[in-house]
Amino acid sequence: MAQRTRLGEILRPLNSEYGKVSPGWGTTLLMGVFMALFLVFLLIILQIYNSSLILEGFNVDWGQ
């Protein structure tokens, strides 16, 4: 038998709608926002890697 946890009880309402299609756009807008934030995160990491984003006191030396 599966063990009940507090986290499981919190997440249960999300799983109760499994297999059903939300009317309209549903959570598409929220997904788009998170994708945009993830893109910004990746761009910042890329700029740090290319040293085009200079951070004071943070030396990036790849050839040790």
UniProtKB/Swiss-Prot annotation:
<keyword id="KW-1133">Transmembrane helix</keyword>
<dbReference type="GO" id="GO:0015979">
    <property type="term" value="P:photosynthesis"/>
</dbReference>
<feature type="transmembrane region" description="Helical">
    <location>
        <begin position="29"/>
        <end position="49"/>
    </location>
</feature>
<dbReference type="InterPro" id="IPR001056">
    <property type="entry name" value="PSII_PsbH"/>
</dbReference>
<keyword id="KW-0472">Membrane</keyword>
<dbReference type="GO" id="GO:0009523">
    <property type="term" value="C:photosystem II"/>
</dbReference>
<keyword id="KW-0812">Transmembrane</keyword>
<keyword id="KW-0602">Photosynthesis</keyword>
<comment type="subunit">
    <text>PSII is composed of 1 copy each of membrane proteins PsbA, PsbB, PsbC, PsbD, PsbE, PsbF, PsbH, PsbI, PsbJ, PsbK, PsbL, PsbM, PsbT, PsbX, PsbY, PsbZ, Psb30/Ycf12, peripheral proteins PsbO, CyanoQ (PsbQ), PsbU, PsbV and a large number of cofactors. It forms dimeric complexes.</text>
</comment>
<comment type="similarity">
    <text>Belongs to the PsbH family.</text>
</comment>
<dbReference type="InterPro" id="IPR036863">
    <property type="entry name" value="PSII_PsbH_sf"/>
</dbReference>
<dbReference type="Pfam" id="PF00737">
    <property type="entry name" value="PsbH"/>
</dbReference>
<protein>
    <recommendedName>
        <fullName>Photosystem II reaction center protein H</fullName>
    </recommendedName>
</protein>
<dbReference type="GO" id="GO:0031676">
    <property type="term" value="C:plasma membrane-derived thylakoid membrane"/>
</dbReference>
<keyword id="KW-0793">Thylakoid</keyword>
<comment type="function">
    <text>One of the components of the core complex of photosystem II (PSII), required for its stability and/or assembly. PSII is a light-driven water:plastoquinone oxidoreductase that uses light energy to abstract electrons from H(2)O, generating O(2) and a proton gradient subsequently used for ATP formation. It consists of a core antenna complex that captures photons, and an electron transfer chain that converts photonic excitation into a charge separation.</text>
</comment>
<dbReference type="GO" id="GO:0050821">
    <property type="term" value="P:protein stabilization"/>
</dbReference>
<keyword id="KW-0604">Photosystem II</keyword>
<dbReference type="GO" id="GO:0042301">
    <property type="term" value="F:phosphate ion binding"/>
</dbReference>
